[in-house]
């Protein structure tokens, strides 16, 4: 088994465009999807991220506001899971509710295991 990180992008603007009832129904799909992963022993953790933040860049440690909501590459949340292999992790990601939106993206990354220190 390996650990994987899913990074969620896009879909943020849809909250403003939908009725509260439709948005609640969409959020319930997240609860069901993650609940199913938990029942199967696949879910390690997941959280949404606040839209505001700071970036620290380079050896001079330049601090800037960001990322910004209007950026297409903004990470809105993450999920960590376990899977037998990369292909299984990708299959798991295909059921993510963010993919209901045309701009929804799930980036799947395998977490490297470092040797014990």
Regions found by a protein language model. Give the residues of each.
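Conserved, structured core segments of small domains
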Residues: 1-117
């Amino acid at each position: 088994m390996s650990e994987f990180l899913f990074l969620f992008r896009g879909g943020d603007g849809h909250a403003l465009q939908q009725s509260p009832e439709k948005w609640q129904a969409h959020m319930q799909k997240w609860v069901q999807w993650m609940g199913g992963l938990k029942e199967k022993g696949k879910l390690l953790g997941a959280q949404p991220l606040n839209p505001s933040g700071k970036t620290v860049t380079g050896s001079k440690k330049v601090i800037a506001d960001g990322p910004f909501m209007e950026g297409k590459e903004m990470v809105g949340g993450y999920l960590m899971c376990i899977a037998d292999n990369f292909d299984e992790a990708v299959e798991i990601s295909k059921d993510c509710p963010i993919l209901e939106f045309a701009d929804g993206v799930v980036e799947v990354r395998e977490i490297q295991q470092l040797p014990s220190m």
